[in-house]
Amino acid sequence: MTDSELHNAIRDRFDDEIATGQSVAVLYDNDPNGPPADGSVWCRCSIKRTDTIQVESGPASYRRHGRVYAQLFGPVELGDGDLLDLADEIGSAFEGVSAGGVRYGAVTVRPIGVSGHEYQVNVEIPFTAD
């Protein structure tokens, strides 16, 4: 799987399950749009590759590892409830799932707290793809 195919597979699943499935605005790296101006819950999604290893000798076969980082933001006055619910939905959509040639591992949810005028919760999703 090429890097382009990998990123597209992850973004497609995130769009289907979270952006569309949960009706949440999602911004990806290098997205020219900014956060929603109406104060609604939104997500910044980044895909970071870590290691690539060769899994077979002979014709090249490689396994790519990395993490998807979903930074969830919502108005401070609403607290963390909606963000933690969304983090749970992300966990259900990815944890232990194989889709589009990508295998997702155990999801970690990290409440961050107040960030500017918003409350933040981060979700980390490890992945592997061949």
Where are these regions (language model features)?
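Short capping loops/turns at secondary-structure boundaries
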Residues: 3, 83, 114-118
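Small/polar-rich, solvent-exposed N-terminal microdomains that initiate assembly or binding
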Residues: 1-58, 78, 84-89, 97
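Oligomerization/assembly interface segments of phage tail-like spikes and tubes
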Residues: 60-77, 119-130
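Acidic-leaning, charged glycine-interspersed low-complexity segments
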Residues: 16, 88-130
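Low-complexity, flexible helical/coil segments
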Residues: 61-64, 77-86, 103-110
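Sterically constrained small-residue positions within well-ordered secondary structures
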Residues: 36, 59-61, 112-116
